[in-house]
């Protein structure tokens, strides 16, 4: 399998489906450059630069026409990894399974702010027709699945939750030793400084040190950090690491294994693959209860999800309050258990197989 063609989560999803015992036939869709540029220009002129034209009526119809209908007729079921609305335009007679980590109703004014009303109408429509066309909807969190039912009217018995697994090779998921004292190594992993809460993470580390807990922050994912933090005594900036590059992937694994706890005080999060990765090593996670994080970080089991308005002092209090040996051991074991039961791609594949068998019996 080509990780460049099936990068990140899509690659892991395809791999998990195959491991679950199914043959996967990739049916690509792609608009021509001319059509893409024409529709993009029209939407940018009409609704403003950067408008999300990918869900426009015109564009999604072009994408749907590019699907190989003969290939669709040859398979037993169709699985959409995002863009499920395309199913509506294809008149597919086979069972349709759609995967996503959110809905437009959730993302509007959460991730996507200031969307033009007409564009919002088109995106919402695209979500709705996809959900209506599918045999079953699969979401990466309870938060997202509830919206499919509440906001789009999908029957709850055809709506499922399968958390995303860790995007690491299972052979590398060897548990660390839980914290037993000494300098606390805290991992932060995220590419968006503001949304992922990097500044709050740094402030938490500063408070920990002021309160007598010697702590050091390992920053991963950020290509650059503000100049004021570049020579910070409590920070090591590892930088952005591309997991498709073997050397950088190994660096990522080595960095995770240095950590005792994972801290990401995010302000918006649909799912939480980084929490699955932390749990794979038995590393407790500390985050905010927002979006889909509650499906990945269970209070008192593999970490703590604080209220969305929690500040750095709150995080420092929670970390300090859970640093005793017994609590760290409990969180360590809970993380490993949750990873084994739900937060890995083999478990995801087994869950998908149960869904397919249930929906096609």
What are these model-predicted stretches?
Residues 327-342:
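A short, well-ordered alpha-helix in the C-terminal region of glycosyltransferases
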Residues 175-196, 202-207, 217-220:
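Conserved donor-binding/catalytic core segment of Leloir-type glycosyltransferases
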Residues 143, 165:
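Carbohydrate-associated surface elements
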Residues 224-255, 261:
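Nucleotide-activated donor-binding/catalytic signature segment of Leloir-type glycosyltransferases, i.e.
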Residues 263, 275, 284-287, 297:
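Short hydrophobic beta-strand element within catalytic cores of glycosyltransferases
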Residues 116-137:
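Membrane-proximal helix-turn-helix segments that form the acceptor-binding/catalytic region
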Residues 267:
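Aromatic "clamp/platform" in nucleotide-sugar-dependent glycosyltransferases that forms part
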